[in-house]
């Protein structure tokens, strides 16, 4: 299935929560934390985020991971949060009585939270990474003692 500009489309899944009773600006703060992270790491970040919106975003992300696992047969450990955005939903208008018979409008904002996860192939270790992983030369205790004795 060709995508935009005939670029290869990575397998993935998405989940949408609509009419969530949180201000879109507050939800965007939380969504910006997890965009581009591996899915399991993003769940951990959301679990410990102090914002109230993190609970709703956590549920949407968990749903997207479950969709990828059950519908697309993807490995949940190889998923990446490729897209995450918050759109504005309808605003409920309420009125609060004020002094001298006036009415004050209160806007109860809602939002739509969308999270898209994609499967990524595990990156093969490069030559530079394998050199860093090689253990350093170990020196014997006798060699280090002779070096320290000569320095004194």
UniProtKB/Swiss-Prot annotation:
One Pfam assignment: Ribosomal_L22
Top-level taxon of origin: Bacteria
InterPro entries: Ribosomal_uL22 (IPR001063), Ribosomal_uL22_bac/chlpt-type (IPR005727), Ribosomal_uL22_bac/org-type (IPR047867), Ribosomal_uL22_CS (IPR018260), Ribosomal_uL22_sf (IPR036394)
Record bears the keyword Nucleus: no
A cellular-component GO term for this protein: cytosolic large ribosomal subunit
Coiled-coil segments: none
Gene3D superfamilies hit by this protein: Ribosomal protein L22/L17 (3.90.470.10)
Region (Disordered): 124-152
Gene Ontology molecular-function annotations: rRNA binding; structural constituent of ribosome
Subunit details: Part of the 50S ribosomal subunit.
Function: This protein binds specifically to 23S rRNA; its binding is stimulated by other ribosomal proteins, e.g. L4, L17, and L20. It is important during the early stages of 50S assembly. It makes multiple contacts with different domains of the 23S rRNA in the assembled 50S subunit and ribosome.
Family, similarity comment: Belongs to the universal ribosomal protein uL22 family.
Protein name: Large ribosomal subunit protein uL22
Classification lineage: Bacteria, Bacillati, Actinomycetota, Actinomycetes, Micromonosporales
Gene: rplV
């Amino acid at each position: 299935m060709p995508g935009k500009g005939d670029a290869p489309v990575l397998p993935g899944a998405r989940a949408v929560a609509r009419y969530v009773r949180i201000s879109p600006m507050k939800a965007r703060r939380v969504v910006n934390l997890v965009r581009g992270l591996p899915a399991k790491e993003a769940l951990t970040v959301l679990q410990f985020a102090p914002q109230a919106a993190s609970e709703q975003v956590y549920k949407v992300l968990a749903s997207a991971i479950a969709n990828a696992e059950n519908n697309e047969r993807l490995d949940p450990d190889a998923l990446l949060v490729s897209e995450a955005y918050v759109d504005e939903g309808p605003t409920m208008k309420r009125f609060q009585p004020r002094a001298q018979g006036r009415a004050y409008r209160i806007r109860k904002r809602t939002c739509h939270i969308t999270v898209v996860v994609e499967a990524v192939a595990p990156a093969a270790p490069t030559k530079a990474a394998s050199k860093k992983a090689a253990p350093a030369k170990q020196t014997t205790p006798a060699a280090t003692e002779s070096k320290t004795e000569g320095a004194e």
